[in-house]
Amino acid sequence: FSQNQKTEIRDKFGINKNDICLTFVGRLSFHAKAHYFPMYKALQEVSKELDKKRTIHLIQVGWFANDFIEKQYKEDAKLICPDIKCHFVDGLDQNQKNLILSASDIFISLTDNYQETFGLTPIEAMAAGIPALVTDWNGYKDTVRDNIDGFTVPTIALKSGSSIDLLYQYYSNIINYDQYIGYVSQRVAVDIDVTIRKLKEMILNDSLRKEMGKHGKERAKSNFSWSVVLDQYNDLRLSLDDIR
């Protein structure tokens, strides 16, 4: 995307040159994707230390499963992070999503849900040339390199086997899958203090963001572009042929 296109999209959301724009991409679901509280709380705390002439914007690109979830997101945003300009955008518009990513300063995704596997959105952000702040969760650990392409934030969970009761209820059809992942996610916590420190470091250091964004873009191209991935699949096919 051209610089003019990036400027236009920032102008559309009222994001000034000195403002900071963070973008989250994914399903907007607090029980089945990522709970918004750590993100909202950390941004609000960081905003207290910013120059009053600078505003933090959070663009959440995704979709809501129902009206109740949408209502909770928007009401809680006003309560938890009143000094953050929150924008909600349709994540099904791929061109708009990619343009917003390219015009953003930081990608943020503090997922805390067991259904999250590889996670494609951090790679999309890296390909757009912006640094990422993500949790050290599942596939995210294999995409974003801590202190290189961005920062990873620790997560804490109850010890192994602590959710057997919920698993029993799920397999017994006492609760459905949606309820199961919601209940299990309550047994995971994101380290908000570390999130605040890392956010502050990224927001206050323009050169760090640019350097991390550069590394991330190089990594996305060299490790995750289709040509590279297809070659890896072909190598796997050949190795399996040898085994057979």
Region spans (language model):
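A short, well-ordered alpha-helix in the C-terminal region of glycosyltransferases
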Residues: 194, 201, 208-222
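Short glycine/serine-rich donor-binding loops of glycosyltransferases
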Residues: 119-122, 140
